[in-house]
């Protein structure tokens, strides 16, 4: 009985909606892994009238105090990385440098994974792990978390995680995170 209660408490907190708006505006949106999922999240931010600047390859030195939140669209695409002329190793280094700079600037960080199972695997997970560890909040399409990977990372990082059924449902919790 105690184990069941503990499981429900841990799982419930991992899937808890972000109840308090915490993220400042404007935001910077970037693609971690260079997948086309970036474009979908861009549309959702626009629809929800969240002011943001979109830069797929922004580097740490491109972050400044003018933006208050870093939104990371995670999911590796070999085609996207190739088109951007960047290796997975260079993308991981860029990601870690971005996260370090965001912390220095006291920016809020939101990780978004909308690619489902197709944007999982070793390459994507190497990018997802540091993003989740440095995030304040995460939103995931449920099909990308069927194995509980994001749930475990969110619990380890002690951050809220919202799971939605469809990409179109990401907009509401994403907008609600902004004050």
Role assignments for model-derived ranges:
Residues 120-152:
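Structural recognition of alpha->loop->beta junctions
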Residues 45-66:
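A short, well-structured beta->alpha microelement
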Residues 91-124, 166-179:
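Ser/Thr/Gly-rich flexible loops in soluble cytosolic domains mediating phosphotransfer, phosphorylation
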Residues 52, 109-110, 161:
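Hydrophobic beta-strand scaffold residues
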């Amino acid at each position: 009985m105690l184990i069941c209660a503990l499981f429900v408490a841990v799982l419930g907190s991992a899937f808890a909606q972000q109840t308090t708006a915490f993220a400042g505006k404007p935001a910077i949106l970037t693609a971690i892994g260079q997948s086309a999922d970036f474009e979908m999240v861009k549309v959702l931010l626009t629809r929800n009238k969240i002011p943001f600047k979109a830069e797929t390859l922004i580097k740490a030195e491109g972050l400044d105090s003018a933006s208050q939140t870093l939104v990371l669209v995670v999911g590796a695409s070999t085609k996207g990385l190739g088109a951007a002329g960047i290796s997975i190793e260079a993308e991981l280094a860029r990601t870690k440098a971005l996260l370090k700079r965001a912390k220095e600037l006291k920016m809020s960080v939101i990780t978004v994974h909308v690619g489902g199972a197709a944007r999982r695997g070793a390459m994507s997970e190497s990018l997802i792990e540091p993003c989740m560890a440095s995030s304040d909040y995460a939103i995931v399409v449920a099909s990308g978390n069927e194995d509980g990977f994001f749930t475990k990372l969110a619990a380890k990082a002690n951050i809220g995680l919202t799971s939605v059924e469809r990409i179109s449902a990401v907009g509401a919790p994403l907008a609600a995170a902004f004050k």
